[in-house]
Design a protein with these regions (language model features):
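N-terminal pre-Walker A segment at the start of P-loop NTPase domains
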Residues: 1-30
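Interdomain motor-coupling "hinge/lid" segment immediately C-terminal to the ATP-binding subdomain
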Residues: 2-6, 13-14, 149-260
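Accessory nucleic acid-recognition modules appended to NTPase machines
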Residues: 3, 69, 215-374
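Hydrophobic anchor at the beta1->P-loop junction of P-loop NTPases
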Residues: 41
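Conserved lysine of the Walker
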Residues: 49
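Hydrophobic positions on the alpha1 helix immediately C-terminal to the Walker A/P-loop
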Residues: 52
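Short glycine-rich substrate-engagement loop in P-loop NTPases that contacts/grips substrate
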Residues: 73-105
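Domain-level recognition of nuclease-like catalytic cores that cleave nucleotide substrates
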Residues: 414-443
Length: 443
């Protein structure tokens, strides 16, 4: 290591120990409590991973840990451009040079942001877990810190923590409008404000920097997120040989949220436009887009692996705000945006999600199994106020309910009041706002 690099690392250690946590909006993210594991904070670009690291640091500070035991170190610094795995030892020695009294005597915590820019960082982190009393958080761009790669490179020594864009509750919290009471207990003005806030959320989405942005700026901002993720996390990382086909695929998926995606049909559509690409390549591109967290794909809920493979998957963007900037008609599609928001909320809650198709051909949007083993059949629509709409949206639930007797069949709508017509047993209804806020089913 050259002396200038060593001096820079030592300076950044001192700065990282002195810095106060910046203002942040608290995220409702589950942290695994398993000793001896590094926590890898992953997620879509600009979803708020760095601020979440600061939240974790602030929580330990509030729990009484001395500030000097909590080191935040950001590796995305042009002065560290030549840093190699062997140079990481100076991070360890430089810290304990300042606090030798704590080595092997008390636990400290390292928050390593953007550590993936250092080649071979994984071996250093594994060695710290094995030989030092250090709790470790790592975070980085999805270009090089993918969940399946973390699992492989860390050899079981890391657990992933997935940070999504803001949920509805987090977006309200960010705006200083988080309700302190359940929806049913709010006054009329409060319920109306929440109804408007949900509709705004389905259009604006949950990316932190997009909150409060005017429509023109928000569209440009979100497009830049998509463009950077596609360029750096897919094209450059995987050396994509057919970027035109990749761009067509991404535009198709983002402009057709919740629609079944058939590789064969998309392959035929590209051929009709004179774009030559192999079907295996389309499969690979879809996987890459999922890895960057741009796209979430939901397969058929079935115990048959073959059935899952031969049936199309339904693709959703990672955030409802991405729908409006790619919607070809230019209209706000609240139904698809709500369905997207529900899926991403199920992911936040750790659910295993698939869609259901009954023998009669009816489809239920989601079958979800939560970590508490509860199961749900969920149908999502913007409104069920009209009798014909209610009948159309509930018949799939009615057909699927006997096939999944252990699951609660639930209709979610933007309406704040239940449908005028009673639902057939055992179907239940809940306002999407109440469900997204985590409220229990009404009695």
């Amino acid at each position: 290591m050259n002396g200038q690099l060593a001096d820079t690392i030592q300076l950044k250690i001192a700065d990282g120990l002195a810095a106060l946590p910046p203002p942040f909006t608290r995220r409702d993210v589950h942290l695994p409590a398993i000793p001896g594991k590094a926590l890898a904070v992953i997620g879509m670009r600009r979803a708020g991973k760095t601020y979440f690291l600061w939240q974790c640091l602030a929580d330990r500070l509030a729990a009484g840990e001395p500030r000097a035991t909590l080191l935040y170190f950001n590796f995305e610094d042009e002065r560290l451009a030549e840093m190699q795995a062997g140079d990481l030892q100076h991070l360890l020695e430089g810290y304990f040079r300042l606090h030798p009294e704590w080595r092997d005597r008390r636990r400290v915590t390292f928050f390593c942001d953007e550590i993936q820019v250092v080649p071979g960082w994984e071996t250093f982190i594994r060695r710290l877990l094995d030989s030092e009393q250090i709790d470790i958080f790592v975070s980085g761009s999805s270009a090089r810190l993918l969940s399946r790669e973390v699992a492989t490179s860390m050899r079981g020594r890391a657990l992933e923590v997935l940070v999504h864009p803001f949920s509805l509750r987090e977006a309200l919290r960010h705006a200083g409008a988080e309700p302190a009471q359940p929806l049913a207990a709010l006054p009329k003005a409060g319920r109306s404000a929440l109804e408007k806030a949900l509709r705004d959320y389905l259009i604006l989405g949950g990316f932190p920097e997009a909150q409060g942005a005017v429509e023109r700026d928000r569209g440009a901002l979100l497009r830049s997120y998509v463009d950077v993720a596609m360029l750096r996390d897919v094209i450059e990382r995987h050396q994509v040989s057919n970027p035109t086909a990749l761009r067509w695929l991404l535009r198709h998926l983002l402009s057709n949220p919740a629609a079944p995606f058939s590789v064969q049909k998309f392959y035929d559509a590209l051929r009709s436009q004179g774009i030559a690409v192999a079907k295996d390549t389309i499969h690979a591109y879809l996987t890459h887009l999922e890895d960057t967290f741009l796209i979430r794909a939901v397969g058929l809920h079935t115990s048959s692996a073959r059935q899952r493979m031969v049936n199309p998957r339904k693709a959703y963007p990672v955030d409802p705000g991405l729908i409006q900037i790619y919607e070809r008609s230019g209209r706000a599609n609240l139904g698809h945006a709500l369905e997207t928001a529900v899926l991403i909320e199920l992911e936040r809650r750790g659910a295993d999600v698939g869609y259901v198709r009954t023998p009669d051909g009816y489809e239920v949007d989601f079958h979800a199994q939560l970590p508490d083993e509860s199961r749900w059949l969920m149908q999502v629509c913007a409104t069920a106020a009209a009798a014909d709409t209610l009948e159309r949206e509930t018949r799939a639930l009615v057909a699927a309910a006997p096939l999944y007797p252990e699951a609660t069949p639930l209709l979610l709508t933007l309406d704040l009041t239940p449908p005028a017509q009673a639902l057939p047993a055992p179907l239940r209804w809940q306002s999407a706002a109440a469900w997204l806020l985590g409220e229990p089913l009404p009695a």
